[in-house]
């Protein structure tokens, strides 16, 4: 359910996403694809964000229209979802890599470029017929994905990229909107894990103000 308690959604067995207005029980069906994933309602329940083919989208529930917020998603570029190393080591096996602003106007998200990460192949023995799985897996000491923090604003084109000192940061380990919605607090970590920096990133410009180390 949305944080304002006005709407909720669920996924049907056929893969459709149904949004329900809790006061009236009126329902709407998201005109999407079964592969759409990682849905999250905006705080004011007016929008439903999701990931489609590694791109971040938002559906205006009232207007019934979807907006594609990123346009470079691919097998090696992930927007709004996490690469394996971030999923496993940084965000505690959480899949979603995006966050609504409190005023529901913008989404901060992670963009992961895995093109330089070695692809590993392993066998999945869980199905009745075993299958091969290919996964971008950075072994210790090898290249990690290049991760950027972007800010997409509903109804506007393009993405504002966060600027936090040397670009790109070796790791972006936390991102959280300030209550005013004008800035995102971002924590960056170096690969040696001995320097953690806190930045406040301006929503409009992407400029990062260094707060502390």
Q: What are these language model-derived features?
A:
Residues 2, 42-44, 101, 178:
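Structural WD40 beta-propeller signal
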Residues 69-99, 106-164:
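Predominantly five- to eight-bladed beta-propeller fold
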């Amino acid at each position: 359910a949305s944080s304002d308690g006005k709407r909720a959604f669920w996924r049907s067995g056929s893969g459709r996403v149904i949004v329900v207005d809790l006061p009236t029980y009126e329902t709407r069906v998201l005109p999407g694809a079964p592969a759409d994933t990682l849905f999250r309602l905006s705080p004011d329940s007016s929008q439903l964000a999701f990931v489609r083919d590694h791109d971040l989208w938002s559906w205006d529930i009232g207007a019934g229209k979807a907006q594609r917020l990123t346009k470079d998603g691919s097998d090696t570029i992930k927007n709004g979802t996490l690469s394996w190393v971030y999923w496993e080591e940084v965000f505690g096996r959480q899949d979603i890599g995006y966050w609504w602003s409190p005023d529901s106007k913008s989404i901060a998200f992670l963009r992961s470029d895995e093109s330089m990460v070695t692809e590993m192949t392993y066998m999945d023995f869980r199905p009745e017929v075993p299958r091969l799985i290919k996964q971008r897996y950075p072994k210790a000491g090898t290249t990690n994905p290049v991760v950027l923090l972007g800010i997409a604003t509903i109804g506007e084109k393009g993405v504002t990229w966060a600027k936090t000192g040397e670009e790109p940061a070796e790791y972006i380990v936390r991102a959280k909107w300030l209550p005013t919605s004008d800035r995102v607090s971002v924590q960056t970590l170096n690969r040696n894990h001995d320097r953690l920096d806190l930045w406040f990133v301006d929503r409009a410009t992407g400029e990062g103000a260094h707060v502390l180390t």
